[in-house]
Amino acid sequence: MNVEDLKKSVTNIVHSMYNFDCSEIVSLTRPPKPEYGDWALSLPLKLASLLKSPAIDIAQSIASALLELDGVQDVYVAKPGFINLKLSREHTTGIISEVLEQGSSFGRNTTQSSKKINLEFVSGNPTGPLHLAHTRWAAVGDSIARILINCGADVTREYYINNVGNQIHLFSESVYARALSKSLPKDGYPGEYVKDIARRIQCEFPNIIDLSYEDAIKIFRKRSWQIQIEEIKKSCIAFRVNFDVWFSEESLHEPDRFGKSQIDKALARCKQNGYLFQKNGAFFIRTTEFGDDKDRAVLRSDTSYTYYAADCAYYLNKINRGFSDLVILVGADHHGYVKRFQAMSNIFHVDSENNRKNVQVLLGQMVLLKNKRQSKREGNVIGLSEIIQSVGVDPLRFWFCRYPIDTPIDLDEQHLKKRSNDNPVYYVQYAYARTRSLIRSANLLQMEKFGFFPELLVHETETALVSLLYDYKTVVIDAARFLQPHRVVRYLESLAGAYHKWYDKCRIIPRKGILDKSEAELVNTRLELNRAVGQVLYNALDLIGVSAPERM
C-alpha cells in the first residue's frame, strides 16, 4: 500500500460512513517526530464544519476503520481531531523489494494517462543565441515533460519560432549590414554571432553583396533566422532537450488553396462566436469579458495582423491537433499572457463547456549572472552553448530545476563547479556513485547471498531511508500534478542526505570481511537497501535529465 492507496482507503471510509466525497481534501503528511507514527491525517478537522460533527468524534470513527486495513499496525487519535498512523514493519520495509523488482519502472504511474498535453517552452526569438533565462526554461520544461510522461501523459514538446515581425526584419538588416561592413541600423543587433551568420550567408551566396537591396534582403531575411534556429537546435540537443515540434509562426500567415490563412480562420471563428468587433478602423477581440485588462487588437487599421492574432491562430492549431491540455512556459515579463490565453479557451469553445481546454501559463523569473541581466540587443548575451561549456549540463539542469520557477535565481558558475558537499548536484551524484561503489566492493569480495531480512534494519538512519523510499511515488505524482520539478530535486537532496548519514553511521561492509552468518545476513540486507536507494536516485535524476555517474 503506497500513499495514494492509503488516500483512497481514507476516501472510501469517509464515503461509506458519511456519504461524503473527501477525495479533493484528503492529504497525508509525515509527523514532526518519528515516534508519532508514519503518517499524519488532519482530515477530521476539515470535515467537522462540513459534516456538522465534532472533529474528535470523526477522528475516532475513521481511526477504528483504519485499524482494519492490511499493513496498518496502530492508529492514534489526538485532540482536537488528528490521526497518526503507524504501518507494520513488514509493510514499510516491503518498499525495498518493490524498488528492486521494478527497477527503472519504479515510480511510474498512470495518474496523467488521460491527458494529451502540448508543452511549449523556450520559444526564444531566432534573433540570437538562447540566453540564461531560456536555459532555465529548457531545463524546467523538459523536466516537466519527463515527469508527465513518467505519469502516463502523452506529451508533445514544442518550440514556437517567432519568425514574423519587426524584430526579424531588424535582425535581418543587422546581418545584412555586417555583410556589407556597414554600421548597424538603429536598435540593431550587435554581437559576434551576427557577424558569423553574415559570413555564413556570404559563403552560401558568394555574389549576394552585388545584388540589389530588395533581392539581397529577401535572402538575408530567410536565412538569418534559419541559421540561428539551426544553432539553437544544436544547443538544445547538447542540453538533452529534444523538441518534437518546431512550429513556425510564418506558417500561420500562409494562405491555403482558397486564399485563407490560419489567422483568417481563427478570426472568422471569433466573429462567429460574437467576440470580434471593429473600432477606429481596427479589429479587436473582447478579451475583457474574461478578465483581461483591455480588449486585444488583432487587425490594425493598415490591415496588418498583430501578435495576438497569430496567438489566436496558434491556439486553434493546437486544439485542432487534439490536445486536451496546453502548458506554456514564459518569462515573468509576459504575465499578461495568462488572461489572454484563458480568454482564448472561452472564446473558441463558447458552444460547449466540456470542450474548453485546460490552459496553464507558467511564469518564470529571470536568471542573473554576476548580477547582470543578459540582452541580445545589448550584445552581452551568454549563450546556452557557452554556459554548458563552462559549467556542464548536469549542474545547470539540476540548479535550474531546484527552485520554483517563480523564484529569481543567481547563477554562481564557480560554486556549481565545486566538487564538495555544499554543491547540491555533486552531493546527490556522489550519493549514487557511493551506492555503485558498495555494489562493486561486494562483488569483488564475492559475498555469498544470505537472504534479505528487513527486520534487521533497526538503526534510525535506516528507518529514515526506508521512509524516504516510500515517499518517492507521491513526490513524482505531485510533481506532475503541480508541474513542479523542484519537488523531485528537493526529494533527491533529502534522499542523498539520508543516505550519506546512513553510510557514515552504519558499517555496510566490514573492513575485515564477514565473520559469521548473522553478520552476513545484516550485510546483505543493508546491501539490498543500498541497491534500492541507488535505483531511486537513478530514477529521480533521470526525471530531471541529470546523469547518474558510476564513479566520482
UniProtKB/Swiss-Prot annotation:
Chain span(s) of sequence motif 'HIGH' region: 124-134
EC code: 6.1.1.19
Alphabetically ordered keywords of this record: Aminoacyl-tRNA synthetase, ATP-binding, Cytoplasm, Ligase, Nucleotide-binding, Protein biosynthesis
SMART domains, A to Z: Arg_tRNA_synt_N (SM01016), DALR_1 (SM00836)
NCBIfam families: argS
Assembly and interaction partners: Monomer.
Protein name, UniProt field: Arginine--tRNA ligase
